[in-house]
From Swiss-Prot:
Chief place of localization: host cell
Name of this protein: PB2-S1
GO cellular component assignments: host cell cytosol; host cell mitochondrion
Location in the cell: Host mitochondrion; Host cytoplasm, Host cytosol
Amino acid sequence: MERIKELRDLMSQSRTREILTKTTVDHMAIIKKYTSGRQEKNPALRMKWMMAMKYPITADKRIMEMIPERNEQGQTLWSKTNDAGSDRVMVSPLAVTWWNRNGPTTSAVHYPKIYKTYFEKVERLKHGTFGPVHFRNQVKIRRRVDINPGHADLSAKEAQDVIMEVVFPNEVGARILTSESQLTITKEKKEELQDCKISPLMVAYMLERELVRKTRFLPVAGGTSSVYIEVLHLTQGTCWEQMYTPGGEVRNDDVDQSLIIAARNIVRRATVSADPLASLLEMCHSTQIGGIRMVDILRQNPTEEQAVDICKAAMGLRISSSFSFGGFTFKRTSGSSVKREEEVLTGNLQTLKIRVHEGYEEFTMVGRRATAILRKATRRLIQLIVSGRDEQSIAEAIIVAMVFSQEDCMIKAVRGDLNFVNRANQRLNPMHQLLRHFQKDAKVLFQNWGIEPIDNVMGMIGILPDMTPSTEMSMRGVRVSKMGVDEYSSTERVPLHQSKVECSSPL
């Protein structure tokens, strides 16, 4: 309040006003800042002062024949004085209004075809159902998601060739349309866009939207298919979520879903054949999804799912270094380890042969209802930061992390024999035996883990062996974060701060 009063007093003095309005800006650093480079430094300000001028627009001389000098109200639409430095005409914003109302009209037949993705979005929203709104803590995880519903999954290069062929067919340049989908789309679009008067550049932009998968790395708490991502801002905030059912499906989400189902079936069949790799590759090559060869889809499609990754790896494609354990996707974000077989004794004196990971590693763990950051050394959990929807989800994540850490106190917490089998009645491997055991009852595990006093860190809280929260004590190395924990994209490396326990998220 004092500051405002002081400013008011200053502004009431005529000298202040004079200094602010009359003095020139002659400081070289300021001039340099606003004049170096072609990039506009303050677009909003520029637009404001341009629009305050009488003729902020320049146009080609032909405008003088097409637009009257004055409108019906007698306001001048363009000035006879030339734009300094070019032979263009200075034009008023009112001329745009005149043109929109009285300018030539053209056939609208191509608009729904060019702006197809927008029209389809409107339809999906019109037929979608919204509500109710729930207020609760949202656990969001950054995931790589598809933000462009309805696209045909072409690669950027394939799409570029199609666009050039459709929009600029006479331009020189080698364009080889090889894939089935490229040829079909090109033929379809050429027919649709005959005699199209919309600017070629606009057509090219819209075609790109229609042909290429665009992905972003966004915090998501619910559905990750593109029809949910397009309404992300309507369905989830920091402390609320709104239920939403999309008013239609799109081809790319169907393909993603079908790809997962096909890959799972293929992997299942291949595992029981005499030569799993050869049989898997043969099936991938002979399978089609929506009329497109599965191998072509696998090359383009970024869906991260276990069976899909197995098929990609078999084809020699790059996959992200993630793996599943206990219903969580683990992604190593830093560190490395070597595997070594080791025999350990459980609390029941049963001998287990486990493959020990030697070395320091950091992982993100992503499950359906909880996420975590795990830092571990050889058979030792250093730190676990968990975030989850409820006590049950947090407990699940803690159990998985404790088992994954391979700590001795976890193995010693086993009571009774480990003899879990899978559906085919085969014994599970030792790590899964341990996991099943503690998923049934984790009381001894939590009690034996040990507790420690904790520092008061914002957004973080301790958790006791009986799963009650505490601000003073916590199970050793374990903290609960009120914010979500981010999943990493396979392409994005994010530096982790290894300094202190007190970082709730590595970003």
